[in-house]
């Protein structure tokens, strides 16, 4: 049995400024007057964070148990240096956050069963302080999440395998909403909207992985993820509809199925690898009205230890990597507004590694 604890202290100071400068002569170039003709805003941000944790680990025969608790205290401030010299402050204090885990080393060599639970907390982002009226901000709560997992893993040469069931509930999601959605007195002035807590996300799924190696240097591996992430509503049907959030709809940009397969070979001097990644269909928006097709991409790499060429090159290696091997045209990230970003074309890179 072992008991340990710790304390995390963080102190941050930063400033954000936007100023405008006159271009001297656009016919010649982009040279500009270094003295701004207008400073739009100049804000100072301060952060003071304290986190403590206590954890106890006990081992009884084939079982190992862990239980812990931690708590966050986050004090953030934003001060305007010009304009209205507004002062905004946010004190985020989490509840005591509990976590627990249990593992069982089964009678089968290399096989282990595990389970875990954890509570998580995310303080209000500092950017929210600059976008939300102080009165409205006082009603914003930190985001929270509860994680549960249950799984099995095997590590016994030449086989490695794992399967994990998970359930994650994410609450108090902070989103930007139009000013017309704000209840009560309009404190916004000229602001178009504010940040508020709005529903959440419920994710559950299964992650599996399998790998097998041979003594001749070859190894095959694969991993599959089934992920069902759906939106939780706010409890106000009209607000949900106005924000185009459908309770139970799949989170945009998140595929239900992801599959990765790879083959790698490691010799005395040379190494080689080829991998393929399948991304399932993804929705473009929170209402799931449009989606983009699934895509499969391939990557490859080859490397050599230069000591095989000359003993004087000991500790040096060269690696060639090709991403998007077939130069596939595809859509990658999704912005949630019905648009997607164009994926990167074929990219070739060479890296030299030197060990001293």
Predicted regions and their residues:
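Gram-negative outer-membrane beta-barrel transporters
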Residues: 59-64, 74, 167-169, 190-286, ...
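Membrane-embedded beta-barrel scaffold of Gram-negative outer-membrane proteins
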Residues: 15, 105-120, 141-213, 220, ...
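Short loop/turn motifs that connect adjacent beta-strands in outer-membrane beta-barrel proteins
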Residues: 1-2, 61-62, 106-111, 158, ...
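Surface-exposed loop/turn segments flanking beta-strands in extracellular/periplasmic regions
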Residues: 14-40, 89, 133-139, 177-193, ...
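Signature of Gram-negative outer-membrane beta-barrel scaffolds
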Residues: 2-110
């Amino acid at each position: 049995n072992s008991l340990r604890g710790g304390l995390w202290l963080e102190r941050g100071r930063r400033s954000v400024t936007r100023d405008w400068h006159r271009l001297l002569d656009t016919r010649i170039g982009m040279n500009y007057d270094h003295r701004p003709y207008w400073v739009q805003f100049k804000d100072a941000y301060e952060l003071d964070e304290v986190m403590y944790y206590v954890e106890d680990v006990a081992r009884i025969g084939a079982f190992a148990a862990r239980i812990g608790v931690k708590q966050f205290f986050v004090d953030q401030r934003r001060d305007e240096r010009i304009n209205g010299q507004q002062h905004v402050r946010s004190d985020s204090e989490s509840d005591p956050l509990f976590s627990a885990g249990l593992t069982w080393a089964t009678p089968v060599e290399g096989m282990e069963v595990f389970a875990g639970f954890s509570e998580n907390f995310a303080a209000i982002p500092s950017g929210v302080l600059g976008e939300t009226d102080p009165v409205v901000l006082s009603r914003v709560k930190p985001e929270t999440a509860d994680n549960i997992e249950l799984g099995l893993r095997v590590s016994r040469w030449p086989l490695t395998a794992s399967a994990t069931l998970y359930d994650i509930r994410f609450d108090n999601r902070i989103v930007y909403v139009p000013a017309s959605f704000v209840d009560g007195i309009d404190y916004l002035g000229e602001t178009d909207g504010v940040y508020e807590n709005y529903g959440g996300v419920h994710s559950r799924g299964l992650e599996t992985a399998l790998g097998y190696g041979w003594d001749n240097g070859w190894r095959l591996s694969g991993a599959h993820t089934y992920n069902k992430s759906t939106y939780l509503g706010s409890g106000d049907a009209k607000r949900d509809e106005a924000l185009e959030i459908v309770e139970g709809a799949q989170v945009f940009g998140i595929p239900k199925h992801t599959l990765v397969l790879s083959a790698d070979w490691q010799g005395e001097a040379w190494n080689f690898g080829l991998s393929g990644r399948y991304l399932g269909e993804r929705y473009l928006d929170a209402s799931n009205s449009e989606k983009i097709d699934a895509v499969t991409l391939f990557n490859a790499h080859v490397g050599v230890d230069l000591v095989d060429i000359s003993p004087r090159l000991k500790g040096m290696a060269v690696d060639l990597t090709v991403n998007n091997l077939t130069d596939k045209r595809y859509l990658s990230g999704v912005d949630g507004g019905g648009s997607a970003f164009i994926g990167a074309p074929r990219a070739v890179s060479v890296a030299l590694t030197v060990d001293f």
